[in-house]
Amino acid sequence: MAGYATTPSPMQTLQEEAVCAICLDYFKDPVSISCGHNFCRGCVTQLWSKEDEEDQNEEEDEWEEEEDEEAVGAMDGWDGSIREVLYRGNADEELFQDQDDDELWLGDSGITNWDNVDYMWDEEEEEEEEDQDYYLGGLRPDLRIDVYREEEILEAYDEDEDEELYPDIHPPPSLPLPGQFTCPQCRKSFTRRSFRPNLQLANMVQIIRQMCPTPYRGNRSNDQGMCFKHQEALKLFCEVDKEAICVVCRESRSHKQHSVLPLEEVVQEYQEIKLETTLVGILQIEQESIHSKAYNQ
């Protein structure tokens, strides 16, 4: 006699509607999301917080890697600029260190004659150029260096200080903007944290709980071939975690980078291996039996 499927009673159907698809228990402070499905406030909040934390950690890791690369390049340029300025400064100091402090333009009274300041600087610049030609004239062109007055070095150093010594530092990453949340039941995406309290459902759950303390999960029960978390058919097999998963699990962070196979292929391969192992065992037993009979004869 062929069996027939039993239909749940109206009370069982009512109980099933009062069960959260995430925790598989009666709703606690139920809220409705944009697609119309209901969940416990604590369940959906915890799910969102976990995803937000993972997203933020990934963005911070990417930002730190970019900052490390930029810092290495900036430090190379900074170090080169410092060495160039120090080298030129030392060359300038050695070039003009032979000038005595007594070589000042003083008047007959022994007091500095400030009227001759312009003449003093012009003549000193000419002497510096002559000294530079004297010291560097005999060098090969590829060994020559530029020698500048101290004032020019300091002026150029101040202009490039902000650009080279203090490279642009990007501000820390801002908090991630609201992303997309996929409903565990219908997988429809919508803006996160867009839910509203469902007071009518909360009152109904309270009445049902008094009548039936233990919830009836019906099709939401973790029967064989159904995902306990997403209530989807287990159609895939994760080769890394060695477990059957649903299509929603496949898109989650825990399995997104893993290699998966259709569950049917894995089951078929397993059955073939099991059958082959069984046949090999039977053949070995038969061979041992034949050898035993031949030995006894």
Swiss-Prot record:
Zinc fingers (RING-type), renumbered ranges: 20-62
Gene3D superfamilies: Classic Zinc Finger, Zinc/RING finger domain, C3HC4 (zinc finger)
Keywords tagged on the record: Antiviral defense, Cytoplasm, Metal-binding, Nucleus, Transferase, Ubl conjugation, Ubl conjugation pathway, Zinc, Zinc-finger
Region of interest (Important for rapid proteolytic degradation by the proteasome), ranges: 72-167
Post-translational modification as stated in the protein's UniProt record: Autoubiquitinated. Polyubiquitinated. Undergoes extremely rapid proteolytic degradation by the proteasome.
Catalytic activity line of the entry: S-ubiquitinyl-[E2 ubiquitin-conjugating enzyme]-L-cysteine + [acceptor protein]-L-lysine = [E2 ubiquitin-conjugating enzyme]-L-cysteine + N(6)-ubiquitinyl-[acceptor protein]-L-lysine
Ranges annotated as B box-type zinc finger: 222-263
Enzyme's top EC category: transferase
Compartments in which it is found: Cytoplasm; Cytoplasm, Cytosol; Nucleus
Pathway: Protein modification; protein ubiquitination
TM ranges: none
GO molecular function per UniProt: transcription coactivator activity; ubiquitin protein ligase activity; zinc ion binding
Enzyme Commission identifier(s): 2.3.2.27
Any Pfam family: zf-C3HC4_4
Record GO biological process: defense response to virus; innate immune response; positive regulation of canonical NF-kappaB signal transduction; positive regulation of NF-kappaB transcription factor activity; protein autoubiquitination; protein ubiquitination
Family per similarity comment: Belongs to the TRIM/RBCC family.
Purpose: E3 ubiquitin-protein ligase. Positively regulates the NF-kappa-B signaling pathway.
Domain notes per entry: The RING-type zinc finger domain is essential for its E3 ubiquitin-protein ligase activity, ability to positively regulate the NF-kappa-B signaling pathway and its antiviral activity.
Assembly description: (Microbial infection) Interacts with Japanese encephalitis virus non-structural protein 2 (NS2A); mediates the ubiquitination of NS2A, targeting it for proteasome-mediated degradation.
Name by which UniProt lists this protein: E3 ubiquitin-protein ligase TRIM52
